[in-house]
């Protein structure tokens, strides 16, 4: 009896496997030599994992007696790994479109924050929103990310600050994890800002004494699954000492460290992340040479967010210096009310133009390296045999089009596949 498989992607012009030796991440040199197959096919099994990838003729012969639930003719098209968005804030109510004009007029992030806008504005609206309202808007945002090719996304809480609302946000993220196809890495970010009426020290004590024990108990009860802990380490928010205490307490209950650092001011956050064994530190616009060296030595990923630097007119993260120093560079959209971007193709484009990354470097940073930052490089980030069958099919004969195009990806991405299941089929694809 012939074996049955879930999906065959056949006759692709190019399949960008990314890695070929089970690498957990790629450094600068490895990024220049991405594994790319020409005239190739890929097979995904009924368990949702990749069974084979190789020359189209070879796959055709090896699977001549097999049957497939679905077959996609990829002639003239390219196949890439599903994109991994390593940093987002997608659960909230109350958009901040009105603040965009303020930014254009010269107001800084902290100007808006101190005036009661920014995070505080979103906290007020998120606190009053129902769990169902938050889930509905969150679901739609994840669907838009998926249509732009993202198949694994890191999702933070952090617009509650008080325990009850933080737990509400984490329950919303857990529901998405249970009900939706897109994969989620859940991050507790209760230290995103200092709540009104509290000092940073009081907020730190509250998080350690009350928030984290509640998270631990809910996790033990199977109510939520939280992967990471985040702190906004910044002047006027949580200083280095408070950040250290919160991260250490989170690590003690089994959370991975993945936090905001060196964004608006040099805080020695990168050095702290390296010291504590963090999986990743995000932003790093103001990182020092010493911090870059520390990240490289510790194999702590730098999650760079070109959207934030672009929108806030910050100095660009030093991607080239980091790559040359041996840092594992990853990318994220930083989707939030302040940086309203769902599209990893757009993030990669900005990384190339503004941060001087190459096309291959940007793709590796948005796939295997972003997966590494989330502790998922063993399942995501490349199209190697044994990994989860998460795939993006674009209607172009060269894979670079997904970064080269400045927008318009809704007419380029033809299929998005998760675990071998076609979760998005674009009926409006146009020829180049």
From Swiss-Prot:
Instruction: Specify the enzyme's EC class, one word.
Output: hydrolase
Listed A to Z, the keywords are: Histidine metabolism, Hydrolase, Iron, Metal-binding, Zinc
Amino acids binding 4-imidazolone-5-propanoate: 159, 192, 263
GO MF entries: imidazolonepropionase activity; metal ion binding
Which residues take part in binding Fe(3+)?
Answer: 260, 334
**EC number annotated for this UniProt entry:** 3.5.2.7
Q: Which cofactor does it need?
A: Zn(2+); Fe(3+)
Q: Which family does it belong to?
A: Belongs to the metallo-dependent hydrolases superfamily. HutI family.
Name of protein: Probable imidazolonepropionase
Species of origin reads: Xenopus tropicalis
From the broadest rank down, the organism's phylogenetic lineage runs:
Eukaryota, Metazoa, Chordata, Craniata, Vertebrata
The gene name on file is amdhd1
């Amino acid at each position: 009896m012939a074996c049955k498989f879930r999906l065959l992607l056949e006759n692709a012009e190019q399949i960008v496997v990314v890695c070929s030796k089970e690498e957990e991440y790629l450094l600068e040199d490895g990024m220049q030599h991405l594994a790319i197959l020409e005239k190739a096919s890929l097979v995904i099994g009924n368990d949702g994992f990749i069974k084979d990838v190789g020359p189209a003729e070879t796959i055709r012969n090896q699977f001549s007696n097999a049957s497939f639930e679905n077959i996609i003719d990829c002639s003239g098209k390219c196949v890439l790994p599903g994109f991994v968005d390593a940093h987002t804030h997608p659960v909230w109510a109350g958009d901040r479109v009105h603040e965009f004009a303020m930014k254009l007029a010269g107001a800084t992030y902290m100007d808006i924050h101190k005036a009661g806008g920014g995070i505080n504005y979103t906290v007020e609206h998120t606190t009053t929103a129902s769990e169902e309202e938050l889930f509905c808007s969150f679901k739609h945002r994840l669907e838009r990310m998926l249509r732009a090719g993202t198949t694994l996304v890191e999702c933070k809480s952090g617009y509650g600050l008080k325990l009850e609302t933080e737990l509400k946000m984490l329950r919303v993220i857990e529901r998405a994890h249970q009900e939706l196809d897109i994969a989620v890495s859940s991050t507790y970010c209760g230290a995103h800002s200092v709540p009104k009426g509290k000092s940073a020290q009081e907020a730190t004590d509250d998080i350690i004494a009350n928030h984290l024990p509640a998270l631990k108990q809910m996790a033990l009860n199977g109510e939520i699954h939280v992967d990471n802990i985040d702190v906004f380490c910044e002047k006027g928010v949580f200083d280095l000492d408070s950040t250290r205490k919160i991260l250490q307490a989170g690590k003690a209950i089994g959370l991975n460290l993945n936090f905001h650092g060196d964004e608006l001011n040099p805080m020695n956050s990168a050095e702290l992340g390296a010291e504590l064994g963090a999986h990743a530190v995000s932003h790093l616009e103001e990182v020092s040479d010493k911090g870059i060296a520390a990240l490289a030595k510790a194999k702590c990923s730098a999650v760079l967010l070109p959207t934030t630097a672009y929108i806030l007119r910050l100095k660009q993260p030093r991607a080239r210096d980091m790559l040359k120093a041996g840092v594992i560079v990853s990318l994220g959209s930083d989707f939030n009310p302040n940086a309203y971007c769902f599209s990893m193709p757009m993030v990669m484009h900005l990384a190339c133009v503004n941060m001087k990354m190459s096309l291959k470097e940007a793709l590796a940073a948005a796939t295997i390296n972003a997966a590494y930052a989330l502790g998922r490089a063993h399942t995501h980030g490349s199209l190697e045999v044994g990994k989860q069958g998460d795939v993006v099919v674009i209607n172009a004969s060269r894979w670079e089009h997904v970064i080269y195009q400045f927008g318009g990806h809704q007419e380029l991405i033809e299929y998005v596949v998760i675990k071998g299941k076609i979760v998005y089929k674009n009926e409006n694809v146009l020829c180049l």
